[in-house]
A protein has these predicted regions:
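A general secondary-structure signal for short beta-strands and their flanking turns/coil
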Residues: 17, 30, 52-54, 95
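Short, conserved turn/kink motifs that form compact alpha/beta structural patches or helix kinks used as
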Residues: 39-75
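A short, sequence-level motif marking secondary-structure junctions
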Residues: 36-43, 87-93
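Short solvent-exposed loop/turn micro-motifs enriched in small/polar/acidic residues
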Residues: 15-17, 65-67, 93
Length: 103
């Protein structure tokens, strides 16, 4: 498992738009929830003085249930399990979208 502090946006980009590449689990979830990474973006201009460039990830999950913001276990074969704070940010016909921010 990679350390959360060491993860970079580039660790996630190979999984963009791969349905089911991520599985969400956690307390209160009866079974894992499949997520698709739909966006990986830098949050600031590159700053060589920073240990890690801040970035954001947006995942799309099923339309129902809408999961509350909290820490979930996110599993992916290449990054390993990570405990991430996810926030629901929008919902449309395709699903519910969740954001994770890395600073």
């Amino acid at each position: 498992m990679a350390h959360l502090q060491e993860l970079q946006r580039t660790d996630f980009e190979p999984h963009l738009h791969r349905a089911g590449a991520f599985r969400l689990s956690g307390e209160g979830l009866p079974e894992p929830v499949a997520l698709e990474l739909v966006e990986a973006r830098s949050l600031t201009k590159a700053d060589p003085g920073l240990r890690r460039q801040p970035f954001g990830l947006v995942f799309r999950g099923p339309r129902e249930p809408v999961l509350p913001q909290r820490i979930y276990r996110l599993d992916n074969p290449s990054t390993g399990p990570q405990d991430l704070f996810l926030v629901p940010i929008r919902r449309d016909d395709a699903g519910t979208y969740y954001e994770a921010i890395f600073t």
